[in-house]
């Protein structure tokens, strides 16, 4: 349990450090290299378009990250008390997390990167957090590849060029042919690629469970769920104003039925 609580502190710090490093690289390396194009107009220059897109992806990722933490699970105490109070206990899908010491309605899993449990109150923000984190990482990887290609005069036309970039760069780094800053960017390329794929896969997995009306906790425990149309399952999580929530980080906009289940 001590190791889990320690991981609950280290993982958010790791995520915030990676986010800070990404912002620094975008601001001081990638954007200045795009400003060197003299043929581009000031309004539609690559630097402006790249900065606007990266800011949009990052704002949604960090905004939903904060909302996942703010929409924390309910405090412990719902099932405690006398026998007369026991009928008010939550449904079987409710779970008590020993790491959070809280009760989560429609518990899915505990996310160490947010230091919080994922349930009915923050599932929507968690999925959008995974989506925009994946997009931000993959987009940063593409921008980093363009930067490395221009600085080191490397062509990525070959399908295996990205796979052979790391071992080749390591040997050139120790021989003095590659600067330390460029080597750091190359390492970040693979980190962005790994995090982007992991978040994309996790987002798709969560969406599949939502379409089925299930949570990871219910699947792990073998709990039976009531069959419902997939549209209703999506609306329960994302609400009727799903498009607005997809573009702007905002609190849960679930339907009235989902709000009643949280009570």
Swiss-Prot record:
It comes from the Eukaryota. Its EC number is 2.3.1.225. Residues 31-48, 204-263 are lumenal. The active site is at 111 (s-palmitoyl cysteine intermediate). It catalyses: L-cysteinyl-[protein] + hexadecanoyl-CoA = S-hexadecanoyl-L-cysteinyl-[protein] + CoA. Keywords: Acyltransferase, Endoplasmic reticulum, Golgi apparatus, Lipoprotein, Membrane, Palmitate, Transferase, Transmembrane, Transmembrane helix. One of its GO terms (biological process) is protein localization to plasma membrane. One of its GO terms (cellular component) is plasma membrane. It is a multi-pass membrane protein. InterPro entries: Palmitoyltrfase_DHHC, PFA4/ZDH16/20/ERF2-like, SSD. Residues 91-131 form the DHHC domain. GO terms for molecular function: protein-cysteine S-palmitoyltransferase activity. It is found in: Endoplasmic reticulum membrane; Golgi apparatus membrane. The chain crosses the membrane at residues 10-30, 49-69, 126-146, 147-167, 183-203. The keyword Transferase applies. Belongs to the DHHC palmitoyltransferase family. Interacts with CNN3. Palmitoyltransferase that could catalyze the addition of palmitate onto various protein substrates and be involved in a variety of cellular processes. Catalyzes the palmitoylation of KCNMA1, regulating localization of KCNMA1 to the plasma membrane. Might also mediate palmitoylation of CNN3. The DHHC domain is required for palmitoyltransferase activity. This is Palmitoyltransferase ZDHHC22.
């Amino acid at each position: 349990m001590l190791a889990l609580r320690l991981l609950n502190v280290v993982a958010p710090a790791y995520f915030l450090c990676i986010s800070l490093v990404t912002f620094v690289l975008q601001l001081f390396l990638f954007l200045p290299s795009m400003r060197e194009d003299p043929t581009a107009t000031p309004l539609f220059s690559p630097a402006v378009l790249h900065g606007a897109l990266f800011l949009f992806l990052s704002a949604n990722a960090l905004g939903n990250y904060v909302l996942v933490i703010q929409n924390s699970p309910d405090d412990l105490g719902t099932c405690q008390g006398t026998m007369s109070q026991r009928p008010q206990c939550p449904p079987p899908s409710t779970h008590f997390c020993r790491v959070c010491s809280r009760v989560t309605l429609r518990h899915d899993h505990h996310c160490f990167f947010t230091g919080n449990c994922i349930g009915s109150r923050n599932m929507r923000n968690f999925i959008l957090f995974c989506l925009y984190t994946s997009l931000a990482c993959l987009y940063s990887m593409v921008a980093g590849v363009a930067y490395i290609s221009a600085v080191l005069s490397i062509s990525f036309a070959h399908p295996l060029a990205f796979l052979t970039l790391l071992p080749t760069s390591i040997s050139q780094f120790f021989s003095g042919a590659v600067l330390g800053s460029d080597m750091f960017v190359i390492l970040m390329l693979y980190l962005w690629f790994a995090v982007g794929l992991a978040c994309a896969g996790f987002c798709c997995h969560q969406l599949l469970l939502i379409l089925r009306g299930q949570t990871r906790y219910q699947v792990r425990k073998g709990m039976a769920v009531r069959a419902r149309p997939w549209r209703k399952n999506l609306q329960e999580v994302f609400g009727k104003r799903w498009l607005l929530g997809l573009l702007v980080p905002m609190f849960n906009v679930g339907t009235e039925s989902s709000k009643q289940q949280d009570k």
